[in-house]
Amino acid sequence: MADMAFTCASCGAQLEYAPGTKAMKCHYCGHENPITASPWSTVAEIDYAAGLAEAEQQAPTETVSVVSCKRCAAEFQLDPAIQASRCPFCGTPIVLEAREVTHLTPGALLPFGFDAKAARAKYEAWLSGLWFAPNNVKRLAKTDNGFVGMYVPYWTYDAATTSDYTGQRGITIVRTVRDGNQTRTVTETRWTPCSGRVARDFDDITVVASRSLPEGYLDRLEPWDLGALVPYDGRYLRGFGAQHYQVGLADGFDTAKAKMESVIRGDVRSDIGGDRQIINALQTDYAAVTFKHVLLPVWLNSFRYGARTYSFVINGRTGEVQGQRPWSWVKIGLAALAAIAVVGVFLAVYGGQN
């Protein structure tokens, strides 16, 4: 992501990427300069073991103007046209310094699908639709800064998995027991040991490689249209920021394996069958593991309401908004009282009939 200058073919002014297109636009004369990829450029999967060895031994290096935040430890590149004095991740004042960083360069990215004006409209719609929010939140909430378009680093992993397991299958038995002159129903589970093997192929398990944003919010921006990935091209970064990864390739794969295991356990339970399942042991082998280092588009901003600042993120492709928000405890209390009243009426009507 080295600093590169892209000039307009018509007037020579600086260009910026126009979201939602495959062109760079000159804001001086309006001329559009198409982004044409090499016919040999592809979005390639990289062998995990080979990539890990490269990361440890001789990852490609480049010198960029890196913005370092001392509060949240974010390191990211800002386009020179972006006049930012605060970290877009946590709002702390930032210092621009040029230094050499060593990292795996991205192999692909998803271009932004809409501009900052559209991002603001999506934020306002999200704010208006919040349940149990104060009535005046839309009128009083003020965004702290302009919207910053940031390419956030991700790893994606593919793997062919084979999992051996041992466990127990539970079958529910309902029987009637006579106790003197009375009968009662007894429910019990009969367990039998079982073992087996399940297999599943995983494609593009995404892992956030940034620690500067709450992972939960970024996870809820999914799904990403990864089928629209384009080979990495610095021209798509003009007018936007790009963060360097903070989660390494190996640590990212550990997170990916945890995501895979959740799915695999569901497969095992289906394979065990019965009414209830217990997994005693599970051993998974991972084969044909490949990865991609990609940049995904996120709009960042925060707003002030009362004495607090609330951060939020927007998927730069789908417009999905996630973030912190204020709550109206008065509305929540009234809703709770209403629910209690409904339950009370139900018990009074139907309980009295019984």
Model-derived segments and spans:
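Short cysteine/histidine-rich zinc-coordinating motifs and their immediately flanking basic loops
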Residues: T21-K25, S38-A44, A81-R86, R99-T105
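Residues immediately within or flanking Cys/His clusters that coordinate Zn2+
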Residues: D3-A5, A23, E62-V66, A84
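Charged, low-complexity helical/coil segments in non-catalytic cytosolic or luminal regions
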Residues: T61, L104-R304, G352-Q353
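Short, non-ligating residues that shape and space the ligands of small metal-coordination modules
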Residues: Y17-A18, I35-T36, L78-D79, L96-E97
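Juxtamembrane/start-of-transmembrane alpha-helix segments at the extracytoplasmic/lumenal side
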Residues: Q324-A335
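Short cysteine-rich clusters marking metal-coordination/redox-active sites
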Residues: C8-C11, C26-C29, C69-C72, C87-C90
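Juxtamembrane boundary at the C-terminal end of a transmembrane helix
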Residues: G344-N354
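Extended, hydrophilic extramembrane loops/domains of integral membrane proteins
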Residues: L296-Q322
